[in-house]
Amino acid sequence: MSSSALQIAKTATYLPDLVEVQRASFKWFLEKGLIEELKSFSPITDYTGKLELHFIGEEYRLKRPRHDVEEAKRRDATFASQMYVTCRLINKETGEIKEQEVFIGELPLMTERGTFIINGAERVIVNQIVRSPGVYFKDEMDKNGRRTYNASVIPNRGAWLKFETDKNNLLYVRVDKTRKINAHVLMRAMGLSDNDVVDKLRHPEFYKQSIDAANDEGINSEDQALLELYKKLRPGEPPSVSGGQQLLHSRFFDPKRYDLGRVGRYKINKKLRLTVPDNVRTLTHEDVLSTIDYLINLELDIGGASLDDIDHLGNRRVRSVGELLQNQVRVGLNRLERIIKERMTVGETDSLTPAQLVNPKPLVAAIKEFFGSSQLSQFMDQTNPLAELTHKRRISALGPGGLTRERAGFAVRDIHPSHYGRLCPIETPEGPNAGLINSLATHARVNEYGFIETPFWEVEKGRVIKEGKPVYLSADLEDECRVAPGDVATDKSGNILANLIPVRYRQDFEKVPPHQVDYVQLSPVQVISVATSLIPFLEHDDANRALMGSNMQRQAVPLLRPERPLVGTGLESQVARDSGMVPITKVNGIVSYVDANEIVVKDVDGNEHVHYLQKYQRSNQDTCLNQRPIVKNGDQVISGQVLADGSACEGGEIALGQNVLIAYMPWEGYNYEDAILVSERMVTDDLYTSVHIEKYEIEARQTKLGPEEITREIPNISEESLNNLDEMGIIRTGAFVESGDILVGKVTPKGESDQPPEEKLLRAIFGEKARDVRDNSLRVPKTEKGRVLDVRIYTREQGDELPPGANMVVRVYVAQRRKIQVGDKMAGRHGNKGIISRILPREDMPYLPDGTPVDIVLNPLGVPSRMNVGQVFELLMGWAASNLNCRVKVVPFDEMYGAEKSHQTVQAFLKEASKQNGKDWVYNPEDPGKLLLKDGRTGEPFDQPVAVGYSHFLKLVHLVDDKIHARSTGPYSLVTQQPLGGKAQQGGQRLGEMEVWALEAYGAAYTLQELLTVKSDDMQGRNEALNAIVKGKPIPRPGTPESFKVLMRELQSLGLDIGVYTDEGKEVDLMQDVNPRRNTPSRPTYESLGTSEYEED
């Protein structure tokens, strides 16, 4: 293929930096967030008020990290920097001031790619979307079908305040869902007189009933109101006026306990049209009165008052890394404050220094807990560059302070009109998290308040103004404008052509003339997320399939020789660049040196810039990270140019799969139900071969009987098996290993008790044996094989941090090449996925008129019912492009260039391809897009013409090698005594109720009995059966399954007298075989078979 790519449809868009969300947020934390927190805790005074400790937040500094990123990964360390802050201790009595720089903890730093390295693993902090603080007005139906209204004031942290009305038109208030209190009681407790309240309201007559109700209860002074408030909020405690005052103040007016946050203050001011200054973050009397006023206007149905939609993106905000980390730092500082106060009280006031007071542990623990075990700190998905990029742009509604899967209803998960251009309507997981985990749209950004904004071009008198920068609008602002979609047709100077334009206005669609349009979307792609925007002809796919297509691109395994798509969307290079997988030069200059490990660029001033390349590193998902240079020595490069390809990249563009020749036709039933028939060429030419790197680890521990030893001298092992081990007993790099081979030899000291009787006898006869050790080596697991890539040895002497009790840790990395095989999962970009059912020799595959055999045969029945016709467009466009020897970029949503544009373009390209020399067979106008294929086995043509073309097909990470599994004898569950489940536990196959029904229906009684007893949890039966098989005797009758006994015991423990009886009414003792069996192991071994119980009579 030539590297020229034709851009069909010009997009006037360049994408923003796609990882900006993460980077900007962390930068804000370092510059502002951390200082804000340190300042808010300063000063800390002791209980007597003698000592004051000030944190001087602006003067905090970070030390250089101890390890750089690569070193941290290799040593399993955290890439972090030490934080120091200047503290000032003031003794009020003597006036003495001590100033000192104090260590307050380690802060993990973000790498350039927007990730964190915690204990050697790359992690991502996912953005969280939560309800914005502010005031919300809702309506509810009471049980008589009458509408009541309520208002909630939700702070960033602190108590919720909820105002509600009842059927008698009385106003009530609840604090944090406690019992309701007459609203006027709260007003009086806050020190407001009746007139203060009445003057502020536009319709005081509604409120007067609440005043009367308060008077009727005998609460007519501030003191009585405070007592009443205290009774309601703290029932059971003796009320007092001072207690009431303190309670009210701490609940709503103390900045440490109640904080609306910058956003909350902004939202309240905006909703209630107030002018309270930005830095007042607690409730004011004005807030409460305006809320009551607004609520009364709602009740009386007076214009200007509107209800809030809590799913509107104007009422939900994004908390990114910076803010989540700031909240965590606050938790740590809260604990620290308590410790400091205690130490101030206990210590000698004169000799105290700031360093003695400040203990870094609570802050370190809080930060560590956040990065290590928070729901939002996730192990990065590194399957391919797209997976990595999408993970950083993910927005989750779960996590601390968010929703839970079980509680989230349908409304929260649903697509909302305000998502347009902000959250992708397509990319979300299938299953219980659907709609709770979203992806940021391509052009969206998060503003300073945490609301998502999206860009537009302004329209003046029907002309789109594309000069200068686009205007970013948040969901609130956009609601008030008439916004046209990005694919409206315009002339050269930007005048809108149509007479009526469909626009969105206040979450509805209407048609207006061009001069009424306020804004036009930047690009048709801005509605969808990055992964979705890589699907060509997306507009022809059903949404459910586009969702699968988006999600499956993230699961594509990087191939040995990746190939970028013939039909792309034009965003491929940006995705590769922003994922951080490809090295980019930051200067203009000349490439002065290139080899496999580094690229050196000399800039204009003669300075050398070295770029080290990643070679065969293991990713989090065991795929292979490797970079290959694409520049040559002496090449001119400009700033921002890609120097090398990463995994799943080619020519600086993302390349997740291969372009293969596909035919849509049934073939001997091998592609029934989404199965895929592939040609042997895929295996022999390594089209879908990928490299996987497994990590195996063993530690030599200190045991009670002495240390374990890593050695070559392993008992009862032939010299042949030790061929590839070095003198230490560790495998040499480059060795090929099969399953069961020793990677690291290790022996463990063995105690007296570990010896079987025959060995004791031998030792008694022949005296002391040389050493008493047991083989405990690290071996290659079943079903695995490969080549040793790297061996790393960690010891305390080298200064490595080891787990407690370990003397040495050895890690072996084994690489395997996995060719495609039957059982692997493959997929296209349109949600068309399937499993390989057969690999045919290429001579048997159907072939084209020029003799080319096809690579893949798919079932045409997979298209109509699933409505993902985009795959057919891609197929034919790819066919034309391959014959024209070019690559094509098609932007989704192309109707702005005319109706049925996709169709016309593909037809035009096919016609163009057939005009080439000797290629007239490529396009048949009678049957466009179809060719008459011949059967490779007989050479006869098939009955019907078949759709053939090139499509981009991916191999997904669900490989059969990782799933195939068999068990003979293995571990059992302790309680039920049934075999465990799953490959990792060496488990058995589950026989569920449906399988039992099938065997019952078939009448296979003995097979069924065997499956439910001796092959599962009849303990005595399975031991006897094994014994019988070993000795060649008939298998005895099965006994009672253990799980049945457990059920009986459980029912008996409820006090039910339940037993099993024979026909004659004689009770069967289920527990008769329990006692003798206690001595034998639960897992039959050949040693236990030799014991006297099972001896022949």
Swiss-Prot record:
Gene3D superfamilies: 2.40.50.100, 2.40.50.150, 3.90.1100.10, DNA-directed RNA polymerase, beta subunit, external 1 domain (2.30.150.10), DNA-directed RNA polymerase, subunit 2, domain 6 (2.40.270.10), RNA polymerase alpha subunit dimerisation domain (3.90.1800.10), RNA polymerase Rpb2, domain 2 (3.90.1110.10). Keywords: DNA-directed RNA polymerase, Nucleotidyltransferase, Transcription, Transferase. InterPro entries: DNA-dir_RNA_pol_bsu_ext_1_sf, DNA-dir_RNA_pol_bsu_external_1, DNA-dir_RNA_pol_su2, DNA-dir_RNAP_su2_dom, DNA-dir_RNAP_su2_hyb_sf, RNA_pol_bsu_bac, RNA_pol_bsu_CS, RNA_pol_bsu_protrusion. It holds the Pfam family RNA_pol_Rpb2_1. It catalyses: RNA(n) + a ribonucleoside 5'-triphosphate = RNA(n+1) + diphosphate. GO terms for molecular function: DNA binding; DNA-directed RNA polymerase activity; ribonucleoside binding. GO terms for cellular component: DNA-directed RNA polymerase complex. Belongs to the RNA polymerase beta chain family. DNA-dependent RNA polymerase catalyzes the transcription of DNA into RNA using the four ribonucleoside triphosphates as substrates. Residues 1077-1091 have a biased composition (Polar residues). It is an enzyme of class 2 (transferase). The keyword Transferase applies. This is DNA-directed RNA polymerase subunit beta. It comes from Prochlorococcus marinus (strain MIT 9515).
